[in-house]
Amino acid sequence: MLLFLTIALPMLGGAAMGLMRFSSAKSRGIYVETIVLATSILTWVLLLTRTDTTYVLCHMNSELALAFRVDGMSCIFAGLVSILWPLASLYGFEYMQHEERPNTFFSYYTMSYAVTLAVAFSANLFSLYVFYECLTLITLPLVIHKKDTMSIRAGRKYLTFSISGAALAFIIYYGTTTDFVLGGVLDAEKISGMEELLKFVFLLAFVGFGTKAAVFPMYAWLPAASVAPTPVTALL
C-alpha cells in the first residue's frame, strides 16, 4: 500500500495543479516542494523497510500485469531519483520566475517524478516498458514548454527517438515470463530456429533503450532537448 501511495502522491498532486490557482510563486513553491519532499521521504521508508513482495496494480491478461517491487536495483535508481528531484525543484522555483506558464511546468514536473519512480519500481519487463513509454509522454510537454519553433522541433525529435524503445515488446513475445529473472527470461524451445531473428530483436531493444538513455552514439536527441527549461534538462 505504501508503494502505491509513493507513486500516487506526486501523480495526483501534480495533476491537481492544473485546477489550482496560487496567490504567489512562493505558495506554489511550497506546495510543490512539500509534495516532492513527502514523496522522497516515503521512497526512503520503502527502501529501508523493503521486502521482496510484488504488488500488482492490474492484470492485462493471464501473463501480463502492471506490477511493482522494491529490489536491489530499485533501491539504486529510486534512491538517486529521490535525492535529485527535491534539489532540482529548489533550482526550478527561481528559474521559472522568468518563464511563462509555471503552473503547467511544475504540474508535469511533479507527475514526471511519479512516473520515474514507477519505472524504478517496475517488477517485470512489461511494466518497465509501459512506464518508460509513459515517461516519454509525460516529459514531452516539458521539452516543448516554450512552444517556439525550436522547442517544437526538439520535441518531435525527442518523441521520435524515444518511442523506438518499443522494440522491447518483441523480446517479451519470445519470453516465458515478463519478470526480471536472473539468467534470462527466454524459452529455448520457443526460439528454436529463430536465433538470428532473436539477435536482431536484441539489437532493436539495445538501440531502443540506448536511445532513451542517450547512450553513445544514440544521443542526438539530448542536445536538441536542451531547449527545455534547465531543471528538466538536468534530470533528463
Question: Where are the model-predicted features located?
Answer:
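Transmembrane helix-loop-helix hairpins at membrane boundaries of multipass inner-membrane proteins
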Residues: M1-L5, L12-S107, V181-S192
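Short helix-boundary/re-entrant hairpin motifs in multi-pass inner-membrane proteins
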Residues: T104, A154, F200-L236
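Helix-boundary and loop/linker segments of multi-pass membrane transporters
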Residues: A67, S151, K190-L197, A224-A228
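Hydrophobic/aromatic residues within the transmembrane alpha-helices of Major Facilitator Superfamily
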Residues: I83, L90, A167, V207-A213
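Structural signature of hydrophobic alpha-helical transmembrane segments
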Residues: M1-L9, G72-S82, L125-I138, E196-F209
